[in-house]
């Protein structure tokens, strides 16, 4: 579960390396987000020459969480880190590559471009 002030690793090559969650999108009372949810975040670390700079406020979709997610068949999926992919207003990724595995739950959330760029879908 991802909440305000959570730090996320960035799983793409947009230039950002670490994000700080400002808000989980989806209503004023929403406290936590899980895989496939959109968050508003600030860039805390960035690589030089990247598209995204330190201090930028961006939208990102959560692709991996330590707490995991329960699937329809009753199984759970967990990852070793919390990670997100920075997206545009039309839900397409800002970067051109996705690093590491992503969860299958992204297919249901209209993030097919991220799923197609990912090396491994679990």
From Swiss-Prot:
Protein name per the record: Large ribosomal subunit protein uL14
Xref: InterPro entries: Ribosomal_uL14, Ribosomal_uL14_bac-type, Ribosomal_uL14_CS, Ribosomal_uL14_sf
Subunit structure: Part of the 50S ribosomal subunit. Forms a cluster with proteins L3 and L19. In the 70S ribosome, L14 and L19 interact and together make contacts with the 16S rRNA in bridges B5 and B8.
GO molecular function terms attached to this record: large ribosomal subunit rRNA binding; structural constituent of ribosome
Name of encoding gene: rplN
Signal peptide, first to last residue: none
PROSITE patterns: RIBOSOMAL_L14 (PS00049)
Organism: Lactobacillus delbrueckii subsp. bulgaricus (strain ATCC 11842 / DSM 20081 / BCRC 10696 / JCM 1002 / NBRC 13953 / NCIMB 11778 / NCTC 12712 / WDCM 00102 / Lb 14)
UniProt superkingdom: Bacteria
Family according to the record: Belongs to the universal ribosomal protein uL14 family.
């Amino acid at each position: 579960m991802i909440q305000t002030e959570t730090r996320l690793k960035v799983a793409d090559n947009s230039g950002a390396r670490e994000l700080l969650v400002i808000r989980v999108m989806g209503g004023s009372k929403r406290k936590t987000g899980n895989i496939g949810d959109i968050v508003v975040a600030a860039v805390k670390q960035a690589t030089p020459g990247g598209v995204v700079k330190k201090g930028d406020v961006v939208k990102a979709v959560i692709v991996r969480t330590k707490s995991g997610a329960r699937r329809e068949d009753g199984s759970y999926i967990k990852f070793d880190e919390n990670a997100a992919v920075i997206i545009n207003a039309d839900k397409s990724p800002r970067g051109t590559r996705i690093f590491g595995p992503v969860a299958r739950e992204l297919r249901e959330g209209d993030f097919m471009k991220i799923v197609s760029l990912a090396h491994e879908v679990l």
